[in-house]
Amino acid sequence: MQKYISEARLLLALAIPVILAQIAQTAMGFVDTVMAGGYSATDMAAVAIGTSIWLPAILFGHGLLLALTPVIAQLNGSGRRERIAHQVRQGFWLAGFVSVLIMLVLWNAGYIIRSMQNIDPALADKAVGYLRALLWGAPGYLFFQVARNQCEGLAKTKPGMVMGFIGLLVNIPVNYIFIYGHFGMPELGGVGCGVATAAVYWVMFLAMVSYIKRARSMRDIRNEKGTAKPDPAVMKRLIQLGLPIALALFFEVTLFAVVALLVSPLGIVDVAGHQIALNFSSLMFVLPMSLAAAVTIRVGYRLGQGSTLDAQTAARTGLMVGVCMATLTAIFTVSLREQIALLYNDNPEVVTLAAHLMLLAAVYQISDSIQVIGSGILRGYKDTRSIFYITFTAYWVLGLPSGYILALTDLVVEPMGPAGFWIGFIIGLTSAAIMMMLRMRFLQRLPSAIILQRAAR
């Protein structure tokens, strides 16, 4: 029992800074929306539309680079720190190549925006302008993620938290300058949010690099000599590990986007209630997602040390802590669902629907916690392909079709509206949780030599 308590303390010490960093990141998006809304409703809508395209694109790159964390954690645990610098350099090359692709996609996103049904031309122009300003921040964001993943792979999660809050503090005044045109800058409205956010991502990257260059704990890595040229073999391995994670993230984000589109014809009350419940459950998701990042680090580190039993302990502890957290957040959601809904909207119909959907959200919080922490465990074992297959099957083969049938057809019951999609979420997330656990048990039952060989790839 003592070993689980000790492991839980280590996991929470790693996870809490990640939680705070994620809160800072979420707050940046909130600040952009509020400040653009203060300028005009059209500008706020433009930022929302632009963000809905930016997120899937940048999260694809983000997911690809998540492969670095278990690689570095495993090298750190095995005492092969002299190889870390080379992996990080290749991570920067990969981030650079992916940035170019993302920037090309975002530059041409106007075709998608202008093809939206009944979109106002002025709104479309502002959304395109926002994206074309924001896309210059894509390299800065991905370079920052490489540096952050280096730190987190070495069990240093506080720097990412600090840089996140630096970014938030810089974002507010820079937004103000470019939205309203102060200090000689042009008045850009919502487009100014894109300029400001792009600049902030570069500030965060440069601040993180400054920390890494000064950190005593990374002196040996910093001083390691090696080629700065692209290494196709290393980059191929990073892509093999990272691409399934990137695709899983992409399909998860697009799932919720598709559901939002399917709910939109049902009416304002249904759309508003669905959005409130989804926004709140997204905030609660920060907790298990951050714990999953910590579990990846601990499992990778223990496997690097050659201890499959300690890796199992880290995995089981992560799941136990995650279930405890999810139970508490579910109780909180059920107890205060109406008060939470009132923070978003005071329309009685919207509040009633949102409160009902939050009950369903509370049901799936435990499944959601298990599946996301399970994904973190599998990343630690470098078993990333299974994450993609499980996520795609659970969300797109089981969850979305079930939700569609329940919400919009009478094949099983009378059309349930948004609640049907939320039951679909429960089916999808519960299926993902079960499959993640089965895969984890399969891996952990392999001979230790095979587990360690797979982890050392």
Swiss-Prot record:
Function: Multidrug efflux pump that functions probably as a Na(+)/drug antiporter.
Keyword field: Antiport, Cell inner membrane, Cell membrane, Ion transport, Membrane, Sodium, Sodium transport, Transmembrane, Transmembrane helix, Transport
Family: Belongs to the multi antimicrobial extrusion (MATE) (TC 2.A.66.1) family. MdtK subfamily.
Domain of life: Bacteria
Residues that span the membrane, as ranges: 11-31, 53-73, 93-113, 127-147, 160-180, 189-209, 243-263, 276-296, 314-334, 350-370, 387-407, 418-438
Cytoplasmic side: 1-10, 74-92, 148-159, 210-242, 297-313, 371-386, 439-457
Membrane topology: Multi-pass membrane protein
MF annotations from Gene Ontology: antiporter activity; xenobiotic transmembrane transporter activity
Residue intervals on the Periplasmic side: 32-52, 114-126, 181-188, 264-275, 335-349, 408-417
GO BP annotations listed: sodium ion transport; xenobiotic transmembrane transport
Chief subcellular location: membrane
Pfam family, one: MatE
InterPro entries: MATE_fam (IPR002528), MATE_MdtK (IPR050222), MdtK-like (IPR048279), Multidrug-R_MdtK (IPR022913)
Protein name listed in UniProt: Multidrug resistance protein MdtK
Location(s), subcellular: Cell inner membrane
Xref: NCBIfam families: matE (TIGR00797)
PANTHER family documented for this protein: FMN_FAD EXPORTER YEEO-RELATED, MULTIDRUG RESISTANCE PROTEIN NORM-RELATED
One GO location term (cellular component): plasma membrane
